[in-house]
Curated annotation (Swiss-Prot):
Signal peptide: none annotated. PROSITE patterns: ARGC. Catalyzes the NADPH-dependent reduction of N-acetyl-5-glutamyl phosphate to yield N-acetyl-L-glutamate 5-semialdehyde. The lineage of its organism: Bacteria, Bacillati, Bacillota, Bacilli, Bacillales. Gene3D superfamilies: Dihydrodipicolinate Reductase, domain 2, NAD(P)-binding Rossmann-like Domain. Pathway: Amino-acid biosynthesis; L-arginine biosynthesis; N(2)-acetyl-L-ornithine from L-glutamate: step 3/4. This is N-acetyl-gamma-glutamyl-phosphate reductase. GO terms for cellular component: cytoplasm. It is found in: Cytoplasm. Belongs to the NAGSA dehydrogenase family. Type 1 subfamily. The active site is at C149. Keywords: Amino-acid biosynthesis, Arginine biosynthesis, Cytoplasm, NADP, Oxidoreductase. One of its GO terms (biological process) is L-arginine biosynthetic process.
Protein backbone atom coordinates (compact mmCIF):
# COMPACT_ATOMS: atom_id res chain seq x y z
CA UNK A 1 0.00 0.00 0.00
CA UNK A 2 1.26 3.46 -0.93
CA UNK A 3 1.32 6.79 0.85
CA UNK A 4 0.78 9.70 -1.53
CA UNK A 5 0.43 13.47 -1.35
CA UNK A 6 -1.39 16.03 -3.47
CA UNK A 7 -0.12 19.58 -3.79
CA UNK A 8 -2.87 21.91 -4.98
CA UNK A 9 -5.86 19.97 -3.70
CA UNK A 10 -8.05 23.08 -3.50
CA UNK A 11 -8.34 23.31 -7.30
CA UNK A 12 -10.68 21.28 -9.49
CA UNK A 13 -8.03 18.85 -10.73
CA UNK A 14 -6.63 18.46 -7.22
CA UNK A 15 -10.05 17.70 -5.78
CA UNK A 16 -10.64 15.13 -8.52
CA UNK A 17 -7.28 13.57 -7.71
CA UNK A 18 -8.24 13.31 -4.05
CA UNK A 19 -11.52 11.62 -4.98
CA UNK A 20 -9.71 9.02 -7.08
CA UNK A 21 -6.82 8.38 -4.72
CA UNK A 22 -8.97 8.28 -1.59
CA UNK A 23 -10.73 5.24 -3.02
CA UNK A 24 -7.72 3.71 -4.78
CA UNK A 25 -7.18 0.03 -3.91
CA UNK A 26 -3.41 0.44 -3.49
CA UNK A 27 -3.34 3.75 -1.61
CA UNK A 28 -3.50 3.65 2.19
CA UNK A 29 -2.90 7.36 2.84
CA UNK A 30 -3.59 10.42 0.71
CA UNK A 31 -2.53 13.70 2.30
CA UNK A 32 -3.14 17.17 0.91
CA UNK A 33 -0.81 20.16 0.82
CA UNK A 34 -1.23 23.82 -0.05
CA UNK A 35 1.06 26.79 -0.58
CA UNK A 36 -1.50 29.17 0.93
CA UNK A 37 -3.45 27.21 3.57
CA UNK A 38 -2.37 25.21 6.62
CA UNK A 39 -4.45 23.29 9.15
CA UNK A 40 -7.72 23.74 7.25
CA UNK A 41 -9.81 20.72 6.28
CA UNK A 42 -10.34 20.24 2.54
CA UNK A 43 -14.10 20.26 3.13
CA UNK A 44 -13.83 24.00 3.81
CA UNK A 45 -13.16 24.38 0.09
CA UNK A 46 -15.10 21.34 -1.11
CA UNK A 47 -18.05 20.39 1.14
CA UNK A 48 -18.67 17.25 -0.93
CA UNK A 49 -15.50 15.74 0.57
CA UNK A 50 -17.09 15.59 4.01
CA UNK A 51 -15.18 14.95 7.23
CA UNK A 52 -12.86 12.27 5.84
CA UNK A 53 -9.61 11.47 7.60
CA UNK A 54 -6.37 12.78 6.13
CA UNK A 55 -7.93 15.74 4.35
CA UNK A 56 -6.39 18.50 6.47
CA UNK A 57 -4.23 20.82 4.38
CA UNK A 58 -0.54 20.94 5.29
CA UNK A 59 2.07 23.58 4.58
CA UNK A 60 4.55 22.83 1.80
CA UNK A 61 7.84 21.51 3.20
CA UNK A 62 10.32 19.41 1.25
CA UNK A 63 11.25 17.18 4.16
CA UNK A 64 7.61 16.43 4.91
CA UNK A 65 6.90 15.64 1.25
CA UNK A 66 9.99 13.45 0.90
CA UNK A 67 8.44 10.70 3.04
CA UNK A 68 5.75 9.87 0.46
CA UNK A 69 5.98 7.21 -2.22
CA UNK A 70 4.54 9.62 -4.79
CA UNK A 71 3.63 13.30 -4.90
CA UNK A 72 1.09 14.78 -7.32
CA UNK A 73 1.31 18.45 -8.35
CA UNK A 74 -2.06 19.92 -9.37
CA UNK A 75 -0.72 23.45 -9.33
CA UNK A 76 -0.46 26.56 -11.53
CA UNK A 77 2.63 27.00 -13.72
CA UNK A 78 5.86 27.57 -11.82
CA UNK A 79 5.14 25.61 -8.63
CA UNK A 80 6.26 22.13 -9.64
CA UNK A 81 9.21 23.55 -11.55
CA UNK A 82 10.46 24.93 -8.25
CA UNK A 83 9.59 22.06 -5.91
CA UNK A 84 9.68 18.84 -7.94
CA UNK A 85 13.47 18.63 -8.59
CA UNK A 86 14.25 18.36 -4.87
CA UNK A 87 11.73 15.55 -4.49
CA UNK A 88 13.05 13.69 -7.53
CA UNK A 89 16.57 13.97 -6.10
CA UNK A 90 15.27 12.28 -2.94
CA UNK A 91 13.82 9.39 -4.92
CA UNK A 92 10.17 10.42 -4.64
CA UNK A 93 8.07 9.71 -7.72
CA UNK A 94 6.47 12.90 -9.01
CA UNK A 95 3.39 13.19 -11.21
CA UNK A 96 2.99 16.77 -12.43
CA UNK A 97 -0.36 17.90 -13.85
CA UNK A 98 0.93 21.38 -14.73
CA UNK A 99 2.83 22.30 -17.87
CA UNK A 100 6.18 22.84 -16.16
CA UNK A 101 7.89 19.73 -17.54
CA UNK A 102 5.98 19.08 -20.77
CA UNK A 103 8.20 21.07 -23.12
CA UNK A 104 11.78 19.89 -23.59
CA UNK A 105 13.05 23.30 -24.72
CA UNK A 106 13.12 25.80 -21.85
CA UNK A 107 13.15 28.73 -24.26
CA UNK A 108 9.92 27.51 -25.85
CA UNK A 109 8.35 27.17 -22.40
CA UNK A 110 9.38 30.74 -21.52
CA UNK A 111 7.91 32.02 -24.79
CA UNK A 112 4.50 30.37 -24.32
CA UNK A 113 4.13 30.46 -20.54
CA UNK A 114 5.77 33.83 -19.90
CA UNK A 115 8.02 32.57 -17.10
CA UNK A 116 11.37 30.89 -16.60
CA UNK A 117 11.44 27.15 -17.24
CA UNK A 118 12.46 24.45 -14.78
CA UNK A 119 16.13 23.36 -14.86
CA UNK A 120 16.97 21.80 -18.22
CA UNK A 121 18.26 18.54 -16.69
CA UNK A 122 14.79 17.87 -15.28
CA UNK A 123 13.05 18.87 -18.51
CA UNK A 124 15.10 16.21 -20.25
CA UNK A 125 14.46 13.65 -17.52
CA UNK A 126 10.69 14.13 -17.45
CA UNK A 127 8.60 11.47 -19.18
CA UNK A 128 5.59 12.71 -21.15
CA UNK A 129 2.64 10.69 -19.88
CA UNK A 130 0.39 10.23 -22.89
CA UNK A 131 -0.21 6.76 -21.53
CA UNK A 132 -1.46 4.91 -24.59
CA UNK A 133 1.59 5.88 -26.64
CA UNK A 134 4.34 5.92 -24.00
CA UNK A 135 3.64 3.04 -21.62
CA UNK A 136 7.15 1.62 -21.36
CA UNK A 137 8.72 4.98 -20.58
CA UNK A 138 5.97 5.74 -18.06
CA UNK A 139 6.67 2.48 -16.24
CA UNK A 140 10.23 3.59 -15.58
CA UNK A 141 9.49 7.24 -14.83
CA UNK A 142 10.44 9.07 -11.65
CA UNK A 143 9.33 12.47 -12.97
CA UNK A 144 6.10 12.17 -14.97
CA UNK A 145 4.69 15.11 -16.91
CA UNK A 146 0.96 14.63 -17.34
CA UNK A 147 -0.33 15.94 -20.69
CA UNK A 148 -2.66 18.90 -20.88
CA UNK A 149 -6.36 18.42 -21.48
CA UNK A 150 -6.48 19.72 -25.06
CA UNK A 151 -3.31 17.84 -26.06
CA UNK A 152 -4.70 14.59 -24.66
CA UNK A 153 -7.85 14.76 -26.78
CA UNK A 154 -5.96 16.02 -29.83
CA UNK A 155 -3.02 13.62 -29.73
CA UNK A 156 -5.11 10.52 -29.07
CA UNK A 157 -7.21 11.59 -32.04
CA UNK A 158 -4.27 12.18 -34.38
CA UNK A 159 -1.70 9.56 -33.38
CA UNK A 160 -2.67 6.70 -35.71
CA UNK A 161 -2.86 8.99 -38.75
CA UNK A 162 0.46 10.70 -38.03
CA UNK A 163 2.33 7.55 -37.10
CA UNK A 164 1.16 5.77 -40.24
CA UNK A 165 1.97 8.77 -42.43
CA UNK A 166 -1.54 8.91 -43.88
CA UNK A 167 -2.08 12.68 -43.78
CA UNK A 168 -0.31 15.66 -45.29
CA UNK A 169 1.95 17.06 -42.60
CA UNK A 170 1.01 20.70 -43.25
CA UNK A 171 -2.77 20.21 -43.21
CA UNK A 172 -3.71 19.68 -39.55
CA UNK A 173 -6.51 21.85 -38.15
CA UNK A 174 -7.89 21.38 -34.63
CA UNK A 175 -11.13 23.02 -33.50
CA UNK A 176 -11.42 22.36 -29.76
CA UNK A 177 -14.12 23.20 -27.24
CA UNK A 178 -13.99 22.96 -23.45
CA UNK A 179 -16.24 23.24 -20.44
CA UNK A 180 -15.67 26.02 -17.92
CA UNK A 181 -13.88 23.88 -15.32
CA UNK A 182 -10.91 23.84 -17.68
CA UNK A 183 -10.29 27.46 -16.75
CA UNK A 184 -9.72 26.48 -13.11
CA UNK A 185 -11.51 27.46 -9.92
CA UNK A 186 -10.17 30.97 -9.45
CA UNK A 187 -12.94 33.51 -9.95
CA UNK A 188 -12.73 35.72 -13.01
CA UNK A 189 -14.96 37.80 -15.25
CA UNK A 190 -14.46 35.44 -18.19
CA UNK A 191 -15.96 32.51 -16.28
CA UNK A 192 -18.71 34.43 -14.48
CA UNK A 193 -22.11 32.74 -14.97
CA UNK A 194 -23.58 35.73 -16.79
CA UNK A 195 -20.64 35.80 -19.19
CA UNK A 196 -20.61 32.05 -19.93
CA UNK A 197 -24.29 31.07 -19.89
CA UNK A 198 -25.96 30.92 -23.32
CA UNK A 199 -22.66 31.94 -24.87
CA UNK A 200 -19.83 30.36 -26.86
CA UNK A 201 -16.58 32.25 -27.29
CA UNK A 202 -13.17 31.66 -28.78
CA UNK A 203 -10.07 32.47 -26.75
CA UNK A 204 -6.26 32.50 -27.04
CA UNK A 205 -6.44 32.47 -30.83
CA UNK A 206 -3.09 31.16 -32.18
CA UNK A 207 -1.67 31.72 -28.70
CA UNK A 208 -2.74 28.80 -26.50
CA UNK A 209 0.11 27.33 -24.44
CA UNK A 210 -0.91 23.81 -25.47
CA UNK A 211 0.06 24.44 -29.11
CA UNK A 212 3.81 23.74 -28.68
CA UNK A 213 3.02 20.70 -26.54
CA UNK A 214 0.88 19.20 -29.31
CA UNK A 215 3.43 20.04 -32.00
CA UNK A 216 6.29 18.60 -29.95
CA UNK A 217 4.51 15.24 -29.66
CA UNK A 218 3.45 15.17 -33.31
CA UNK A 219 6.99 15.95 -34.46
CA UNK A 220 8.33 13.19 -32.23
CA UNK A 221 6.19 10.78 -34.23
CA UNK A 222 6.86 12.44 -37.59
CA UNK A 223 9.44 15.21 -37.76
CA UNK A 224 7.92 16.52 -41.00
CA UNK A 225 4.72 17.71 -39.24
CA UNK A 226 4.33 21.46 -39.76
CA UNK A 227 2.88 23.96 -37.26
CA UNK A 228 -0.80 23.27 -36.73
CA UNK A 229 -3.85 25.52 -36.78
CA UNK A 230 -5.40 25.24 -33.32
CA UNK A 231 -8.39 27.10 -31.88
CA UNK A 232 -10.07 26.82 -28.49
CA UNK A 233 -13.61 27.73 -27.44
CA UNK A 234 -15.33 28.03 -24.08
CA UNK A 235 -18.68 26.22 -23.90
CA UNK A 236 -21.39 26.75 -21.22
CA UNK A 237 -20.97 23.35 -19.56
CA UNK A 238 -18.96 22.22 -16.55
CA UNK A 239 -16.88 19.32 -17.87
CA UNK A 240 -15.81 18.00 -21.22
CA UNK A 241 -13.62 18.60 -24.24
CA UNK A 242 -14.45 17.95 -27.86
CA UNK A 243 -11.61 18.21 -30.36
CA UNK A 244 -12.74 18.15 -33.98
CA UNK A 245 -9.66 17.49 -36.09
CA UNK A 246 -9.29 17.91 -39.84
CA UNK A 247 -6.40 16.77 -42.04
CA UNK A 248 -5.84 16.21 -45.75
CA UNK A 249 -5.20 12.59 -46.70
CA UNK A 250 -2.17 11.76 -48.85
CA UNK A 251 -4.34 9.32 -50.79
CA UNK A 252 -7.89 8.05 -50.68
CA UNK A 253 -8.74 6.09 -47.52
CA UNK A 254 -11.54 3.60 -47.12
CA UNK A 255 -13.69 4.74 -44.17
CA UNK A 256 -13.85 1.14 -42.96
CA UNK A 257 -10.06 0.86 -43.13
CA UNK A 258 -9.81 4.10 -41.17
CA UNK A 259 -11.94 2.73 -38.35
CA UNK A 260 -10.02 -0.56 -38.41
CA UNK A 261 -6.73 1.34 -38.13
CA UNK A 262 -7.89 3.08 -34.97
CA UNK A 263 -9.30 -0.08 -33.44
CA UNK A 264 -6.02 -1.87 -34.08
CA UNK A 265 -3.97 1.07 -32.79
CA UNK A 266 -5.87 1.18 -29.51
CA UNK A 267 -6.28 -2.55 -29.00
CA UNK A 268 -5.29 -3.23 -25.41
CA UNK A 269 -5.95 0.39 -24.37
CA UNK A 270 -8.81 0.12 -21.87
CA UNK A 271 -9.73 3.80 -21.94
CA UNK A 272 -9.89 4.56 -25.67
CA UNK A 273 -13.13 3.58 -27.38
CA UNK A 274 -13.51 3.79 -31.15
CA UNK A 275 -17.01 4.34 -32.56
CA UNK A 276 -18.44 2.37 -35.44
CA UNK A 277 -18.43 4.03 -38.85
CA UNK A 278 -20.98 6.85 -39.00
CA UNK A 279 -21.19 7.22 -35.21
CA UNK A 280 -19.69 10.15 -33.33
CA UNK A 281 -19.20 10.71 -29.60
CA UNK A 282 -20.57 13.49 -27.41
CA UNK A 283 -18.95 14.89 -24.28
CA UNK A 284 -21.76 13.40 -22.19
CA UNK A 285 -20.58 9.94 -23.25
CA UNK A 286 -17.39 10.26 -21.18
CA UNK A 287 -18.59 12.52 -18.35
CA UNK A 288 -16.87 11.73 -15.04
CA UNK A 289 -14.75 8.95 -16.57
CA UNK A 290 -11.24 8.29 -17.83
CA UNK A 291 -12.42 7.37 -21.33
CA UNK A 292 -11.53 8.99 -24.62
CA UNK A 293 -14.14 8.27 -27.30
CA UNK A 294 -13.23 8.75 -30.96
CA UNK A 295 -15.37 8.95 -34.10
CA UNK A 296 -14.04 9.04 -37.66
CA UNK A 297 -15.03 10.08 -41.17
CA UNK A 298 -13.43 10.50 -44.57
CA UNK A 299 -14.78 12.87 -47.23
CA UNK A 300 -13.92 11.74 -50.77
CA UNK A 301 -14.96 15.13 -52.13
CA UNK A 302 -12.44 17.14 -50.07
CA UNK A 303 -10.00 14.29 -49.36
CA UNK A 304 -10.10 15.22 -45.70
CA UNK A 305 -10.19 13.00 -42.66
CA UNK A 306 -12.34 14.19 -39.74
CA UNK A 307 -11.61 12.90 -36.24
CA UNK A 308 -13.89 13.70 -33.30
CA UNK A 309 -12.22 13.07 -29.95
CA UNK A 310 -13.96 13.66 -26.60
CA UNK A 311 -12.72 13.44 -23.01
CA UNK A 312 -13.66 14.68 -19.56
CA UNK A 313 -11.10 17.44 -19.03
CA UNK A 314 -10.81 16.77 -15.29
CA UNK A 315 -10.45 13.00 -15.73
CA UNK A 316 -8.66 11.80 -18.87
CA UNK A 317 -7.51 15.39 -19.34
CA UNK A 318 -6.04 15.67 -15.83
CA UNK A 319 -6.60 13.58 -12.69
CA UNK A 320 -7.70 10.34 -14.34
CA UNK A 321 -4.72 10.17 -16.68
CA UNK A 322 -2.44 11.10 -13.77
CA UNK A 323 -3.70 8.10 -11.80
CA UNK A 324 -3.42 5.92 -14.92
CA UNK A 325 0.25 6.91 -15.16
CA UNK A 326 0.75 6.49 -11.41
CA UNK A 327 -0.55 2.93 -11.73
CA UNK A 328 2.02 2.09 -14.40
CA UNK A 329 4.84 3.77 -12.48
CA UNK A 330 4.02 1.54 -9.51
CA UNK A 331 3.78 -1.63 -11.58
CA UNK A 332 0.01 -2.10 -11.38
CA UNK A 333 -2.70 -2.49 -13.98
CA UNK A 334 -3.21 0.95 -15.52
CA UNK A 335 -6.97 0.77 -14.90
CA UNK A 336 -6.76 0.40 -11.10
CA UNK A 337 -9.15 2.81 -9.43
CA UNK A 338 -10.44 4.06 -12.78
CA UNK A 339 -12.88 1.43 -13.96
CA UNK A 340 -16.07 3.41 -13.31
CA UNK A 341 -18.31 3.96 -16.31
CA UNK A 342 -19.25 7.52 -17.30
CA UNK A 343 -22.00 9.29 -15.37
CA UNK A 344 -25.17 9.52 -17.42
CA UNK A 345 -27.30 11.48 -18.00
Amino acid sequence: MMNVAIIGATGYSGAELFRLLYGHPHVSQCDVFSSSQDGIHLSESFPHVGAVDGAVLHKLEIEALAKYDAVFFATPPGVSGEWAPALVDRGVKVIDLSGDFRLKDGAVYAQWYGREAAPSAYLERAVYGLTEWNREAVRGAVLLSNPGCYPTATLLGLAPLVKEGLIKEDSIIVDAKSGVSGAGRKAGLGTHFSEVNENVKIYKVNAHQHIPEIEQALQTWNEAVAPITFSTHLIPMTRGIMATIYAKAKQSISPNDLVDLYKTSYEGSPFVRIRQLGQFPATKDVYGSNYCDIGLAYDERTERVTVVSVIDNLMKGAAGQAVQNFNLMMGWDEAEGLRSLPIYP
